[in-house]
From Swiss-Prot:
Active-site residues, as the UniProt record annotates them: 43 (proton acceptor), 70 (proton acceptor), 190 (proton donor)
Residues binding 1-deoxy-D-xylulose 5-phosphate, per UniProt: 45, 50, 100
Name of this protein: Pyridoxine 5'-phosphate synthase
GO biological processes: pyridoxine biosynthetic process
Enzyme class: transferase
Entry superkingdom: Bacteria
Residues annotated to bind 3-amino-2-oxopropyl phosphate: 7, 18, 191, 213-214
Amino acid sequence: MTKLSVNINKVATLRNARGGNNPDVVKVALDCEAFGAEGITVHPRPDERHIRRSDVYELRPLLTTEFNIEGYPSPEFVDLVLKVKPHQVTLVPDAPDQITSNAGWDTKTNLSFLTELMDTFGQAGIRTSIFVGTDKEMIEYAAKAGADRVELYTEPYATMYPRNPEAAIAPFIEAAKVTRSLGMGLNAGHDLSLVNLKYMHTHIPWLDEVSIGHALISDALYMGLKQTIEEYKNCLRS
């Protein structure tokens, strides 16, 4: 079964735009769980423009599903993850001022750096995932670094899907097969939506997890959070 992890960063963005605590990020996360989400994802950035470190600490003891913290592994980020001990940490190669993730790791160039991080998090009992594109070599070096999983960066798929679904999914099927052959788990995320999620899941049914935030929260403005989560989970049913 492919798990749906809801990224709640956009909820925090809305809260921070006005100040105060409305919407309540913690309540939304707990409601997502109650409505069927199998995980919660947060991406705390250095400027705390959406999720704050205090949110991460507040969420950890309250969540009953998988907690995934993603981000660039700066010393501050590593320290936060080791203190909070989520179920999973997803490493992304973002610059501090980046609006959103837009590429996977060059795992070959960063092999020693990533290997050390995999060891650090692994010793703490935290499952590791490295954000990568579909290049076979990058996936192979993620395995060499000791990653438990990779998360495929799916923006190229989402962009091409409306024009040519078969061409859009083809490199991701191959990347998914390589990942499976190397014994790693498989996650996916970035620009997945109700438009393109079911097609991806149909062709890669062994996905362990999809992390979805922007599209899901946008859909919830029209359908409500409960129905939206149900619709996304329907896309993940065989």
